[in-house]
Amino acid sequence: MKHFITCLALAFVALNASAQTLWRGAPMNASPAEIRALMPEIQDTSPAQRALDRGALLQIPSTLIADEDFAVTYHFEAERLQRIHLHAKVPTPARTQTLLRALQVTLRTSYGLPIGTKARQDANALPGSVDLKWAFRRMTVQLQMVDGTTVNLTYATNIPSRPAAL
């Protein structure tokens, strides 16, 4: 009986240890080479972008999501994927609201209710600004709209890229 319980516990651990993915199947802590192999349309970021953010190594300059054009940037720390940032500049506030509704429905379906909404302290923030956050296993997903036409969607790991020193 003791062996059965041990085997059952190990099987449970193995099932939960499977690689968790961020956006479009990109595994957490994947290397840039692994992401390139997974997504053939991916490109290196420009030297100017890397100068602003050393971790922003890969990008998809344009991809359609809910009928809007997004730029996607893959951020790495110690050569391990930590964050994927999707950015869209939508032409009109009405289309922005349509996009936000579509994204919220998808995110709620995938991850449940958001864990938080951040109250904006910025006096320039428009009424109806969105800042929602979801937590799912070892990642967070954040959906933001601040200026009426810019939408940011960020998938980030909640696990360190390398063990902390003692």
PLM regions: where:
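Mid-chain, structured segments of secreted extracytoplasmic proteins
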Residues: 59-103
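Sec-dependent signal peptide recognition
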Residues: 2-8
